[in-house]
Amino acid sequence: MDWKKLQDLLSGVNQYSTAFGRIWLSVVFVFRVLVYVVAAERVWGDEQKDFDCNTRQPGCTNVCYDNFFPISNIRLWALQLIFVTCPSMLVILHVAYREERERKHRQKHGEQCAKLYSHPGKKHGGLWWTYLFSLIFKLIIELVFLYVLHTLWHGFTMPRLVQCASIVPCPNTVDCYIARPTEKKVFTYFMVGASAVCIILTICEICYLIFHRIMRGISKGKSTKSISSPKSSSRASTCRCHHKLLESGDPEADPASEKLQASAPSLTPI
């Protein structure tokens, strides 16, 4: 697996992320990818080779190993890291789509035309939803993999001894011993803890995005009200003045004066 390419891709997401997203990316690379590459692969490298059983029955050791380890921890973590980082690619693709659309718009209408997007990487409109859905996908993937890890091995511990009973071709109950069980247990706890930290950071980032969106909507509503309030007050004052003028007029006006006003020419100032 080429981790350098994965790092380069995710570094592109970093410029569009919030503070929580940058911390999440640091945790993924420092506490998960580096530990996986440097240490965990070596600890689990001899997993099947040093899985020792007290039987000489051909095929029994392999069957017992497959029964207890349907999928190796190290491969499950590799899949988890790949699937967890994939939703971040949605953000990069969406930004690339915006930039391409902006480029075509400028080619068609010229460089002096108005921009479609003031900033293609700003989390507004559809990009905000893309970013939010990518966080939700990451959260679901983390929880699913933790559940799978806990279910397959009945917890996060690594026993020293496992027993295979009534499994063909093993003749009877066979005792098998796992290599480096304590070391594997420590790494399992460490990776589960790092995954839990990533889950907490993702939840915090989702809450931050929603809260920021709500506050921005409230501030927009207040600014709209402040702009529209002078117009409404001027209209109200005009109506009040007009009402006072009507009230100040004599309802019982002299009919003669009304006739004189009607016969007088209407003079308009030039």
Swiss-Prot record:
PROSITE patterns to which the protein is assigned, alphabetical: CONNEXINS_1 (PS00407), CONNEXINS_2 (PS00408)
Predominant location category: membrane
Bilayer-spanning residue ranges: 21-40, 76-98, 127-149, 189-211
Protein name: Gap junction beta-3 protein
Subunit structure of this chain's protein: A connexon is composed of a hexamer of connexins. Interacts with CNST.
Species of provenance: Mus musculus (Mouse)
Annotated family: Belongs to the connexin family. Beta-type (group I) subfamily.
PANTHER family for the chain: CONNEXIN, GAP JUNCTION BETA-3 PROTEIN
InterPro entries recorded: Connexin, Connexin31, Connexin_CCC, Connexin_CS, Connexin_N, Connexin_N_sf
Keywords: Cell junction, Cell membrane, Gap junction, Membrane, Transmembrane, Transmembrane helix
